[in-house]
C-alpha cells in the first residue's frame, strides 16, 4: 500500500510518520489530529477526544475555548500505538505534534499550543501540508498528496473490506449517509474477489 511505503521511508522524520499513520488509522481530519494534546491521549484505549468540524458549543459565552465544545472520540490501532511513545520521548503535556523551533518574538500563541518542556509550538496545518508535499511531490512544489487523502483512503479501504454504511458513518463521524456513500467504490481487485464467490463449487453459496 502506498501509505505504508511512504511511512517506511528512512528519510521521513518520526513526527511525520506518526502524524500520517494517525491520520490514516483514525480517519480523522487533519485539523482534529493536529489539535490533539498529549494529556488527551488514552494510550490503553487507543483513543482521544477531538474537536470536530462544526463542533457544537456547550455554551454561548464569548471567548470560547476547546473545552466549551462537544468533543468526539477518535480511535487508532497498532501502528500509531507503536509510534506515539517514540515520538513523545517522555513528554506528558502540550501538543502531540510540534515544530522544531520556538515561536518568533512578538508572536502571540495560546499556552495550549506550546510544549511546556521544550517551548516548541504546535505544528500548523500549513506546515504539515508542506511537509507531506515535500515527500510526495513528483512534478514540483504543490503537486504532492493532500492531508485529506489519508482520511479518504482509510474510509475507502474500510468500504472495500465490507464495512457497513452505519459503521463508516461512526468511524468518519459524518452525519449524512450521502457523504459516506462515495467511499463505497470498490477497486478492481475487490470486484474480482467478489466475483470469485460465483465460481463453480464455491462453498459459501
UniProtKB/Swiss-Prot annotation:
- What Pfam families does the database record attribute to this sequence? Phage_integrase (PF00589)
Q: Which residues cross the membrane?
A: none
The record's listing under SUPFAM superfamilies reads: DNA breaking-rejoining enzymes
What GO molecular function annotations does the UniProt record carry, in alphabetical order?
A: DNA binding
Keyword tags: DNA recombination, Transposable element
**What sequence ranges are listed for the domain Tyr recombinase?**
1-196
Family per UniProt? Answer: Belongs to the 'phage' integrase family.
Query: Which protein is depicted?
Result: Uncharacterized 23.1 kDa protein in transposon Tn4556
Originating organism = Streptomyces fradiae (Streptomyces roseoflavus)
Query: What taxonomic ancestry is recorded?
Result: Bacteria, Bacillati, Actinomycetota, Actinomycetes, Kitasatosporales
